Amino acid sequence: MKHPFQIITTDKSGKHLFATVKNNLQVFDLESGSLLGVWIDEVNSNTSLKKQQEEKIKVLQAQQEELTQTSEDTEQENTAPYKKQKSSVSKPIKVPKIPVPGPGAPPIYNYIRALTLSKDEKFLIGITDSDKSVIIFSIDFENTENCLTLIKRQVFPKRPCAVSTSIDDRTVVVADKFGDVYTIEIDSEAAIDEKELSPLLGHVSMLSDVKIAEHNGKQFILTGDRDEHIKVSNYPKSYIVKHWLFGHREFVSSLHIPDFNTDLLISGGGDEFVCLWNWYKNELLSKVPLRDLIQPFLTDSHLPPERFLTEDSKREISISKILTYVNPKSSEKLLIVLCENTNCVLLFELKDDFSIIHKCTLKVNYSLVDICLDQSSGTFIASKDIESGDDLLEFYQINNDSNNLEIVDRSNLSKAISTANNCEVESRDQFYPLYYINSLRKRSEH
């Protein structure tokens, strides 16, 4: 059986699909389904552990040399003709073992955690879990052998979790799981030592998403975290915090700035609603309630872990994707929301006064892992969570007359792309993480 695609995205032309599956990056032609480019992360997932071991050995060697030299100096100073001193023999270094996760520890996966295109779509940027790196590829569709060329692999001190690019596409902005934000240049210069990297800004909580926004020609960094916060900081002078956006009660996992209004921020996470903000003015414009709409599609898999389960526990909502679309026929603005591990897509109309009207709920037969939108044609592509068959994708069309989502038959294209995906597994037990956003939710022991 085929492993589902974990992340999918398209370019603005709608001609190419970029996808991740396990430790593979794949690029497909959306007309023929042919594979145009591929990259496989061959770095062992134990690389960071081995690196820790090597660093510990270096420290021990330095300490051993210092102790040996000190012992020799002391012996020379205290040596007397009438007293024979015991020679100081340095003990061999005890090589530290590579740490091995104990029983019950979560498995270590080698997969691509995030994926985004630069604004000019000349570069593809991802995050590898194997060695805590950001990977940058140049894209050349004239290269018929492989359209992807890795130009930089930068290791970070802590595991990155989200990336964005500056407005001019010269810089990658990287958020990590320890609350720090870094920047690196988009170029072919060699990566620098991770110890030389300095954080641009920080949170006291784990970061979940990062975006670069612009207002009147000035750039800002927007960061969302596990502690319900959205921080708006100046860029590049990020030590100047403009303000915080307060309105969420649970973690923030998804930040979206639509092209049709770059002062508008749409945010979602572990709450039962999505927030609409004027991020520059620090105004909460409206909230989109989701509970009644999504409740029929929640299952027992959305309940809290057993140790936190009570009689009053609700099935939990986690936002995995927020998208927007402008109907070219009517100029109406649409908001699309995907909740994690559900078999539906919610579609809303966004009015000029920022009020929201629910247009439709598209129900499908399988849970959806990820969705992306071809802005040029209004075509949605969804990655399906299936355990049999080779039809890993499903296509939907926005009806520009009714603003509803409709399933379209592109089974031949889906099968061609699915066949080109060479990541085979024997059972679902071998799937890499498909649904992990809800793990950001904080739990109380009381």
UniProtKB/Swiss-Prot annotation:
Residues 67-97 are annotated as: Disordered. GO terms for molecular function: enzyme activator activity. Residues 87-97 have a biased composition (Low complexity). Keywords: Nucleus, Repeat, tRNA processing, WD repeat. Pathway: tRNA modification; N(7)-methylguanine-tRNA biosynthesis. It comes from the Eukaryota. One of its GO terms (biological process) is tRNA (guanine-N7)-methylation. WD repeats lie at residues 107-147, 202-243, 247-287. SUPFAM superfamilies: WD40 repeat-like (SSF50978). It is found in: Nucleus. One of its GO terms (cellular component) is tRNA (m7G46) methyltransferase complex. Disulfide bonds: none annotated. Belongs to the WD repeat TRM82 family. Forms a heterodimer with the catalytic subunit TRM8. Required for the formation of N(7)-methylguanine at position 46 (m7G46) in tRNA. In the complex, it is required to stabilize and induce conformational changes of the catalytic subunit. This is tRNA (guanine-N(7)-)-methyltransferase non-catalytic subunit TRM82. The gene is TRM82.
